[in-house]
Regions:
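Intrinsically disordered terminal and processing segments
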Residues: 2-95, 101-185
Length: 185
């Protein structure tokens, strides 16, 4: 009985709700790689040293030590690349798609998944202009500051989730800057 009570208490503390799709991945790809008519997925399997370097830079290690970049082309011309990044929060995971121009700047950001609990916060943050604050960022440049950018126009929980999106964008910038050129065709 004591074990059952402890399990219930832990479950109450870890009140993670189901994940919902806010934007389907194919729709995010089309939005972030406009005009592309061909796509390729490229995996980068990180060595222990590379994984440690990424973890030190942005406190993150990709699942199974593998980064996946999606490139888009229109004919023979590169349209850009994107990466889907998962951010684990106390309220459950969110997934952020970060698209890059061929010049390496952030083209756009789309929050593709969140938990049922966080969905209204994400929608409020996006409505307050969150994703506009990431355009033009480059690896090694300014840190993502979307949360600070919407602080005066959104509630505390929307600003909180914006900070989590900032983490996802920072992780994508670090991964793209350090590893994308090694796999570009």
């Amino acid at each position: 009985m004591n074990l059952l009570i402890r399990a219930a208490a832990i479950a109450a503390l870890l009140h993670i709700t189901p994940v919902v799709v806010l934007v389907k991945r194919p729709d995010a790809v089309q939005a972030l790689l406009p005009g592309a008519d061909a796509y390729v997925a490229r995996e980068v399997h990180l060595s222990g040293t590379d994984a440690h370097r990424l973890h030190e830079a942005v406190d993150w290690s990709p699942e199974d030590g593998v980064l996946v970049f999606y490139g888009g082309t229109a004919g023979s011309t590169s349209v850009g690349a994107l990466e889907f990044v998962r951010v684990d929060t106390p309220h459950g995971p969110i997934e952020v798609a970060v698209g890059f121009t061929p010049q390496g700047a952030v083209r756009g950001v789309v929050v593709t998944k969140a938990t049922v609990e966080m969905k209204p916060w994400v929608l409020e943050a996006v409505a307050a202009g969150l994703t506009d604050h990431y355009r033009g960022l480059k690896p090694g440049g300014e840190a993502p500051a979307g949360a600070a950018g919407i602080a005066s126009r959104a509630g505390n929980l929307a600003v909180y989730v914006a900070g989590e999106v900032d983490k996802g964008v920072a992780r994508a910038l670090a991964a793209y800057g350090a590893f994308y050129n090694h796999v570009r065709a």
